[in-house]
Amino acid sequence: MDKEQIHDEVSLSLRNEMESVWDINRRYWYPLNECKRSDLIAFNADYIEDDKSKHEFILTVLKEHGIEQIYEFLETGETYRIQISDLHPFYGYYGAIGGEGFWCSDKMDWIIYASHEGTITFGGEWLVSKLKSVWIDWRNHVDWDSKN
């Protein structure tokens, strides 16, 4: 695993930018809190975590979009730059330092959020559209009041 920790001002600046772009104004995000963005969909986490092909598809879609490195923001306050192949957007995946997480690229035109309440949220019009076009049963697995 190739993981570079980002410290101090840079980490804070990146986190602030992500929160601004994605209307994240509390510790928890969509669907646990309201969000002004309309390009979001929240799934029951089991829908993705229990199907290895879905995780592989997420990685493939991001790679096809030219994404090689991403930012990982953990609820512990730590920020990392990781390779796309090291993306595991699941609650608690990283053991003791796990918990909730946000993942996005430096363009911040997409986002993934894994919550403590068993949801995985995807944001970004292109990413949400791609997931819906391939995961034909997606409507059966949206969580809470997912907008789409």
Regions found by a protein language model. Give the residues of each.
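Structured alpha/beta or helical-core interaction and ligand-binding surfaces enriched in interleaved
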Residues: 1-148
